[in-house]
Curated annotation (Swiss-Prot):
Organism placement in taxonomy: Viruses, Viruses incertae sedis, Naldaviricetes, Lefavirales, Baculoviridae
Record: residues binding Zn(2+): C169, C172, H189, C196
Intervals holding BIR repeats: 29-96, 131-199
UniProt keyword terms in alphabetical order: Apoptosis, Host-virus interaction, Metal-binding, Modulation of host cell apoptosis by virus, Repeat, Zinc, Zinc-finger
Record InterPro entries: BIR_rpt (IPR001370), IAP (IPR050784), Znf_RING (IPR001841), Znf_RING/FYVE/PHD (IPR013083)
Pfam families in the cross-refs: BIR, zf-C3HC4_3
GO molecular function, one term: zinc ion binding
SUPFAM superfamilies according to UniProt: Inhibitor of apoptosis (IAP) repeat
Function statement: Acts by blocking cellular apoptosis early in infection. Later, stimulates caspase-3-like protease activity and induces apoptosis, probably to favor the release of occluded virions.
PROSITE patterns: BIR_REPEAT_1, BIR_REPEAT_2, ZF_RING_2
Keyword set includes Hydrolase: no
Species this protein is from: Autographa californica nuclear polyhedrosis virus (AcMNPV)
Protein name listed in UniProt: Apoptosis inhibitor 1
Length: 286
């Protein structure tokens, strides 16, 4: 393939991915470009498109790996719609979703590529994974008329950018703006990105797809709750926030001690045993 460095238009495609400076993005593109030296498909335009879409060659057949979500994909055809294949085969990839926002996919697109290794959803802004960190971003410039919504917006995984009423998800990087008083913040987030791993983990797939009606019950307004129900609620309250019910079993230690929302704010250590946490299983207490 061509030895030249990637054309500069790559930067304009990628520099809005907020977690990287333009200089760092360019360095990543150069590194990805170099990895395709011995790629079996010699179509330069196709290779450039793979690079733009976050892929590097892993030196096995025609397998490529996304630098952001680590999904591994093979069996490409030169007429493949790479953007569509990436976001379809790895729907949690924040980078693939950001590029797909700019695309208009037609109907009946055929995907020839095959997923070898599933991608892992990655948090874009780890520093904002803690609820209080997100709350703190609303201190300055947030519109006074929307001040009562700050807690709900932050709990839905969003932090304030300092511009108008623009908020961004700490996990998937989607942008939510033009808020109205008393809006359902979770529904707005899910509407912007129904594939957000944080929203899916907390609210469930059905909620994100708007296929069922979700009813929120506030126990403070429910006069029918008895003392026994209150005892159960206290028994299973999250050990971190002391407010929500536990619904996450931490892996691999299997301690049942936090809610899913607080799981995303952990320092990757179980609060009970301090063992490294690699994943969680969501459960429902009935």
């Amino acid at each position: 393939m061509n030895e030249d460095t990637p054309p500069f238009y790559f930067i304009s495609v990628c520099d809005n991915f907020r977690d990287n400076t333009a200089e760092h993005v360019f360095d990543m593109l150069i590194e990805r470009h170099s990895s395709f030296e011995n790629y079996p498909i010699e179509n330069t335009a196709f290779i450039n498109s793979l690079i733009v879409n976050g892929f590097k060659y892993n030196q096995v057949d025609d397998h490529v790996v996304c630098e952001y979500c680590e999904a591994e994909i093979k069996n490409w055809s030169e007429d493949e719609c790479i953007e569509y294949a990436h976001v379809t085969l790895s729907p949690y990839c924040a980078y693939a979703n950001k590029i797909a926002e700019r695309e208009s996919f037609g109907d009946n697109i055929t995907i020839n590529a095959v997923l070898v290794k599933e991608g892992k959803p990655k948090c874009v802004y780890r520093c904002m994974s803690n609820l209080q960190s997100r709350m703190d971003t609303f201190v300055n410039f947030w519109p006074a008329a929307l001040r009562d919504m700050i807690t709900n917006i932050a709990e839905a995984g969003l932090f304030y950018t300092g511009r108008g009423d623009e908020t961004v998800c700490f996990f998937c990087d989607c942008c939510v703006r033009d808020w109205h008083t008393n809006e359902d913040t979770w529904q707005r987030h899910a509407a912007e990105n129904p594939q957000c791993y944080f929203v899916l983990s907390v609210k469930g797939k059905e909620f994100c797809q708007n296929s069922i009606t979700v009813t929120h019950v506030d126990k403070r307004d429910d006069d029918n709750l008895n003392e026994n129900a209150d005892d159960i609620e206290e028994k299973y309250e999250c050990k971190v926030c002391l407010e929500r019910q536990r619904d996450a079993v931490l892996m691999p230690c299997r301690h049942f001690c936090v809610c899913v929302q607080c799981y995303f704010g952990l320092d990757q250590k179980c609060p009970t045993c301090r063992q490294d946490v690699t994943d969680f299983i969501k459960i429902f207490v009935v």
